[in-house]
């Protein structure tokens, strides 16, 4: 008995057999470095756990002949085999012809964790990795591979094998290693012979000077000669030759024919040798037959199959019948049959089943169908088997069973024993429907099929969507602790998809849904991740269809800049906005022009725009922008003066001149060079043009004398009176001096009163007068020694003049001087003025300084005890608008509360008991006694306070009347009474106002409430809320008398007052009006909407009465102001009020007409109005044009009017597109879907009517293709319109578009073929005209190909509609033609690589490319075309894809060079080489050498039409001299072909079911499924 001391070791005395089964020869050199000659079915499978009931196997034989031999003693173990030597692919591995060896030590252990691959324990990828690779491995390699480092100290030296078993240490270590964790390193390995690295290699994988001892060498045989003389490795020969061939050879060489004769002799010898070694025996391969066995014999046979020591040749004699399908796999699992032997059984059963199907069939088609059906049924059985194992999760030995089932299924898959399409479809469906608990199991299996599944788009895209769906489902549950590992694993898979299989994430229908999810899986800090994601996002964006109108109306750069301008009013951040504007628009001239237009347009309001523009221009001037040139250019080219307030533009320039930012001398030089021009006004003779008119607006106060003289000279040349400007300034100064005699010296003058309207005076005049006023105020304040240098009246007058001028910068200087006064009224007025002009002064940068100055004056007056409540109120209101001054406002409120509490706690005076009886508002001493009472510092009781309030409210009701106190003073006294008892005062005022509302003879509420609002006792908002509350209850109680009159009172309360005097109370009321309009625009619109119906003729006489006669006109102006102030909110409100509000619609139309510069009284036809509105739209007027069109569309208009509007809109769309504008899109969005569809269809008709290529382009004698350039530009316009209106395309698509697109692509392909032929014919010519013609053609080709691809994307749905039964063939033909055209054009290799350029609508190569020309970075046009093809293939049926593949292979010879291009294989796969082409059903196709007669996809013929040799040559020209590829490129599909008379009969169909080893009991010479005679195989003799 041989001791089993080295389980798993190689028998040292066992000779290795060669391939020919020649056991008599013991050539051991074949055991080393033998190449892998086994089939894929014999590849390595990891060792599987032994079933608990299975006995241990000790037999180490590998064949039937060796199984009968006795086992010699085991060889001594060799220690310290390093990991490198065992992992080395050149390490010796025994070659076998049967099944792999499985040792008992491994059979008793659990599956190895395969830690050397660095994969987690749960990954099945390592278990089938050897199946995927081409290297051969055995189970012994799996034992050797996990070895670790060299042990620190070697174990004791082992005893000889014949003296007993080795030390217990080795056996115990081996046992422990097999039972321990899989990651633990094995300490010892069996002895293996190593080939020295320096040994020279010989032919036949032999090694020289190296013969390892195997026990039966000749020197081991003891004979008499060996004992006496020793052993010699070569036979001794005598030193002298017995005979020589020299004489005979010399005699032959002397003749001329000697060499030829010798050559013939040697050739005859070689031929005989070749014929002798050639295998001529026919193939004797037959699948092993199946026999019927009893159950016991069947179980015994299966147990023998599970035993690796039983050779397969012996088992092949008695394969039991009745084991098939899922039952076969269950038997393999229950018996733990090794995977490679289980696959052998599957092949045997499958081969017999398929042959049985062939015997039943009568025709070729029926046989193929039966075989396919059987394979699909078998695949279903495998799926059921795997589902059963997965469903048993959690049971005993589930992990081992899952490992076996996964390994066996993967082996079947990679052996091509399954229907891959069906298997992958089931796999993806199962993964998609799996619960989150089972997803990890499917992910482990996914690692096995990862590369195979992502080889084709059909599976890769669906896998990507399934993984993204599972990740979305995981993140939605919000269980970070439990699902975080799963989410990380899914993210890792998705990231690997993005980085390695980017094209699988081209998702035409779900990109927007999964975009953020994909982004979350990447590390955007990594350059690779960011670059690939940007490219992926761009590729997806180019094949997306706009799903809504908002997608089609994206904001342009001009609109973004305008939005930034509008945001300054709220943010007040000039620095960041300046940088943002420069970054948003690269064209600096356009940026400056847009800023000037924004500041002057009538569709915006506010004086702050002037100072915003001035500050931005100063910032840009510092940044290096040439604002002088751009401003002058704007003035010389401005045309739409009706919608621009040019006074604002001149104001901006005057501010720039004051700050020396604008160069006056440069402007004068430009004007001299240009010449002063006049512009006809049509009525009043001639006026100066806008650029020359600036000459009259320039302030000259700080300019040198020679510049002033030059300006006067140019004014004289322009016909402008020079004396008129100086006289106007003199008259203004004189008039102001008369009104302010204390500040300015009054001179005797006969000058009349000058109108201070800013439209009547130039900025040269206003600037001169304003600076004179500022200088006078400053001088007056410095010279005076009085407490208050300015009186309130003087301050009001100065403020009124500067406000009429609109010169806020000078006003800010005057306010800064007025802060030094000690008059509370002036300081309160200064605070109110800053608050009123808050936006403009903030843009100037003076708001914070003025507020701090006012706070300083407040502190000064507080210390002196001369503080007034008016000043405190105004200062607090101003501080509330400054976010940085919240602390100061808090202190001011504390002081105000302290004052009010002090007044409330003061004791009433004893004299006040008699006051109510003696107080009378008619009394002359009423005001004096009231001021004495308020200033005495004593308190007031409620009765006294009530008497005073009653007297003051009576004065307020009568409007002053006979009382000595005015209504404004009465309201001021009411405000002074508030600190004594605020609650009582508010109650009295509420009762007073409520009494007025109930009174039928109440006065006009605007006269009563204006002063109350001015002093702060009542607010407009609180009064409106009170009226609304009472109106809600008035329906039942009648609380308000004459509510219609009250509505008009409220509206009149919001209108600007006519009085010109602006004292403190009036000015505060204006401030309150401004605040209400800004904060409550919706309430204002409701007030206007309620009051407008009362303007009708029925109510006019009764309601207006003594009111303002211009109330309707003022209402229109108020509504226009609201539209300009808050356009977005007001426009939205107006859109909602269009239906059912005829009166409001009428007033709104007038306000919009005023904004648009139209005449409200002009009664034009709706169609004419619509045409005029459409043509005047721009970046600023767009929302108002939309509103005007909406008003027109709501009017009763017939179909003729609507059709006319559609015509006008289409013309406007073409005009705007030509001008690079997109305003028309917003106007079309107001129209219904039908109108947008009509406009789009007109654009499509015009697009398809444009000639793609003119005849002049085909003539190489012409220098350029100017006509083509114009056609390209026209096509661009129509394509832009189609893209913008893509939302009007129905979901079902437009069925008339696909045929047009297919025909256009065919025409494009035909032109490309003709151009290639012409290029080949004139290749020798290198004239300039030829080069330009080629470039023009390629430029046109790039555009039309890109444009047609875009239309295909937009109308993709039309290709996907399932056709009717009668048109199914035509639809399939169109789909195939479309794919063929796209692939052939994208495949074309043009001289200038035009198809590799960026497919942007606004980028095309120059006519003559510069020397340093480089393509624009981005997505290549070729890549974009393939992405479009991928999006089509996703929705096309498989039949269209298969027809496209068949067509390109059979009828497109140039495409044969690119069949193995990974991109096309990815798109059109899976493509089976065994599929019989349609042309082979009747006759064999031509060989590649005979491609001249093969038909090609010319556009004129359909896929089933006729073809010509000329067309073939044309198609072959696509890849002619410019392809750069060899014509003899070998294809994978053509490597196995049957040659018959020089013709190829097609690829030989290799059947994986017949790739069986050990199929026959006796090994024959030609025992192979593929007959060796077909390949002229020869015997290889060692």
Swiss-Prot record:
Q: Which UniProt keywords apply?
A: Activator, Nucleus, Repressor, Transcription, Transcription regulation
Q: Which domain of life is it from?
A: Eukaryota
Q: What is its main location?
A: nucleus
Bias regions of kind Low complexity — which residues?
Answer: 1479-1493
GO MF, one annotated term: transcription coregulator activity
Biological process (GO), any one = regulation of transcription by RNA polymerase II
Q: Which GO terms describe its cellular component?
A: mediator complex
What would be one Pfam family of this protein?
A: Med12
Q: Is Repressor given among the entry's keywords?
A: yes
The listed locations are: Nucleus
Free-text function comment from the UniProt entry = Component of the srb8-11 complex. The srb8-11 complex is a regulatory module of the Mediator complex which is itself involved in regulation of basal and activated RNA polymerase II-dependent transcription. The srb8-11 complex may be involved in the transcriptional repression of a subset of genes regulated by Mediator. It may inhibit the association of the Mediator complex with RNA polymerase II to form the holoenzyme complex.
- So what family is this one in? Belongs to the Mediator complex subunit 12 family.
Assembly notes: Component of the srb8-11 complex, which itself associates with the Mediator complex.
Specify the protein name. Answer: Mediator of RNA polymerase II transcription subunit 12
UniProt source species: Emericella nidulans (strain FGSC A4 / ATCC 38163 / CBS 112.46 / NRRL 194 / M139) (Aspergillus nidulans)
